[in-house]
């Protein structure tokens, strides 16, 4: 560790804002999905309301956003080998979009609801990760 202290710059404030937005999106999406699944009538349905109308995986978008925010906040005080830590948000993005997370959930959803016209339209019109107005 080092004893480097610096005043928070515009980059740090941007990092804080991204972290707060990302955290809020992730928690809100998780809460919306939990509330949806808690209702018996939704037991075998997919969620397509709230943040889930904007993205098929808004919780992962929030997760990625908050880690980019942490990196921006930390960047001004990192040096040398510490800069390797900046790979973290890229790794989280890669992991969630290419390895686990989205690919696994999409395969499971396709198997479960792939024959549903509503699901086919939802998947066609709703971005996988980056939100877009429905």
Q: What do these predicted ranges mean?
A:
Residues 1-32, 37-134:
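Hydrophobic transmembrane alpha-helices
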